[in-house]
A protein has these predicted regions:
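Bacterial N-terminal signal peptides
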Residues: 10-19
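Cross-family detector of peptidyl-prolyl cis-trans isomerase
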Residues: 2-5, 22-240
Length: 240
């Protein structure tokens, strides 16, 4: 069920904080008219945010929203006891969940198709090799010293891109390398970095099965995304 009631309570709480700051600075008590308008405007802003966020799924009628607000304020309706309203809110929630699921599935399909095409093209480049589970890589500098093990801690600089070239993360841009245990990251990294040594540089094209799979990662990496990385191994610390 949508948390409409919590939205209203949150608005009142924020209003209290805002009013409190006014009292502290000006020591002026707002009139009932001003206070009422302020609370209404605050709640209206929050409702507008909700309406705007859901407009691709549901076309709300502002006039009917005002009707519902008016009836609730006048005590003509109690959302907690009105079965029709509860059923309507549950229906809204189901519609939003269904739309979100469909959107994720659409994103995943597009990402998979784009990734499949990208990997096929990358595999044709000079010097590119593939592991048995589909990791594509190109070693631009092998590095020196002992081989890297999955249990080692490595310090690296990297840039990660989607097939369309969009950078989703880069320690290089931040100017700060990262350090981690190699067996605690995505499988493509665990496997790929063991192909070079300290000082090595490698390009990795990681299929979704060896990256973030159907879950994706936040807003920057969609489900079923193929990932491209340029990685430089700055240091290696074997497990003690």
């Amino acid at each position: 069920m949508l948390k409409i009631q919590k939205l209203s309570l949150a608005a009142l709480m924020v209003s209290a904080v805002v009013s409190g700051s006014v009292f502290a600075e000006d020591k002026a008590v707002p009139s009932a008219s001003d206070a009422s308008y302020a609370v209404g405007a605050l709640m209206g802003n929050q409702v507008k945010d909700l309406v705007d966020a859901q407009k691709e799924v549901i076309q709300y009628d502002n006039a009917r929203i005002l009707d519902g607000l008016k009836d609730a304020l006048e005590g003509k309706v109690d959302v907690r006891k009105d079965e029709k309203i509860q059923k309507t809110l549950d229906g809204i929630q189901e519609q939003l969940v269904s739309a979100a699921k469909a959107k994720v599935e659409q994103q995943a399909k597009a990402a998979k198709e784009e990734g499949d095409k990208y990997r096929a093209e990358f595999a044709k480049k000079d010097g590119v090799k593939s592991t048995k589970d589909g990791l594509l890589y190109k070693i631009t500098e092998a590095g020196k010293g002992d081989g890297i093990k999955a249990t080692d801690t490595v310090k690296v600089h990297y840039t990660g891109k989607l097939p369309d070239g969009k950078v989703f993360d880069s320690s290089v841009e931040r100017g700060q390398p990262v350090e981690f245990k190699l067996n605690q990251v995505i499988k493509g990294w665990t496997e790929g970095l063991q192909l070079v040594k300290k000082g090595g540089k490698i390009e990795l094209v990681i299929p979704p099965e060896l990256a973030y799979g159907k879950q994706g990662a936040g807003d920057s990496i969609p489900p079923d995304a193929t990932l491209y990385f340029e990685v430089e191994v700055l240091d290696v610390n074997p497990k003690k």
